[in-house]
């Protein structure tokens, strides 16, 4: 699977090379996430995200962008006086966000697109102990996310970006297996703040 992802990204790089002058870079940052459909709420699970990207012009002010991104998602609840329950879920993914960007000016842009992902592994624990990986609904090996964000060029090389992404399909079923209308299971809801190093 790692070879497949690398091959896909290299193909995008090759297409960009022959189609238009391309730009690229790498990035790192933090993610804050929750799982919609569980019994916990709030963007309390903090994780890491990092990767690389390429981009190229379409018709100004539009550009396309493709990333290869490692990202941690999940859910977290800290114990308190009122609630002794503790819960932590950390899910590790590789994503390939495919984005369209609209530049408002030379420094500020909006972006939106889809991001196929591959589930790598997870760790789940409560106030008692680690929860075995085979306990509860299985995680879907492949997923799809929809995302939108905003970015700002601090300098010609440094960009700060904020993006929200949401599972377009459930990342796993409800523990009960029940579904209702559009609620088909549990969904990742993630905010990612990243610092990009950009080169041309």
Can you say where each PLM-predicted feature lies in the sequence?
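Membrane-embedded beta-strand positions of outer-membrane beta-barrel proteins
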Residues: 26-28, 66-68, 98, 112, ...
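Residue-level signature of outer-membrane beta-barrel architecture
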Residues: 54-56, 102, 118, 152, ...
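Outer-membrane beta-barrel channels and translocator barrels
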Residues: 19, 59-61, 105, 155, ...
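Residues that define the transmembrane beta-barrel architecture of outer-membrane proteins
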Residues: 20, 42-48, 90-94, 140-144, ...
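Outer-membrane beta-barrel "beta-signal"
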Residues: 23, 27, 150-159, 185-200
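Transmembrane beta-strands of outer-membrane beta-barrel pores
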Residues: 30-34, 70-74, 116-120, 164-168, ...
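Repeated loop/turn-to-beta-strand initiation elements of outer-membrane beta-barrel proteins
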Residues: 22, 61-64, 108-110, 156-160
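Outer-membrane beta-barrel translocator domains and adjoining extracellular loop/strand segments
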Residues: 36-41, 76-83, 122-130, 172-178
């Amino acid at each position: 699977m790692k070879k497949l992802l690398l091959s896909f990204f290299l193909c995008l790089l090759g297409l960009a090379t022959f189609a238009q002058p391309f730009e690229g870079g790498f990035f790192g940052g933090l993610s804050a996430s929750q799982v919609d459909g569980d019994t916990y709420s709030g963007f309390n699970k903090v994780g890491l995200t990092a990767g690389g990207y390429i981009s190229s012009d379409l018709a100004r002010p539009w550009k396309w962008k493709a990333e290869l991104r490692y990202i941690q998602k999940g859910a977290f609840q800290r114990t308190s006086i009122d609630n002794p329950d503790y819960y932590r879920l950390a899910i590790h993914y590789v994503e390939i966000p495919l984005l369209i960007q609209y530049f408002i000016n030379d420094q500020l842009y909006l972006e939106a697109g889809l991001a196929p992902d591959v589930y790598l592994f997870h760790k789940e624990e409560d106030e008692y102990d680690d929860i075995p990986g085979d306990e509860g609904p299985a995680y879907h090996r492949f997923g799809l996310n929809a995302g939108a964000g905003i970015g700002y060029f601090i300098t010609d090389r440094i960009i700060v970006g904020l993006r929200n992404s949401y599972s377009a399909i459930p990342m796993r079923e409800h523990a009960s297996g029940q579904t209702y209308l559009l609620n088909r299971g549990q969904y990742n809801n993630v905010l990612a703040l990243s610092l990009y190093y950009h080169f041309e």
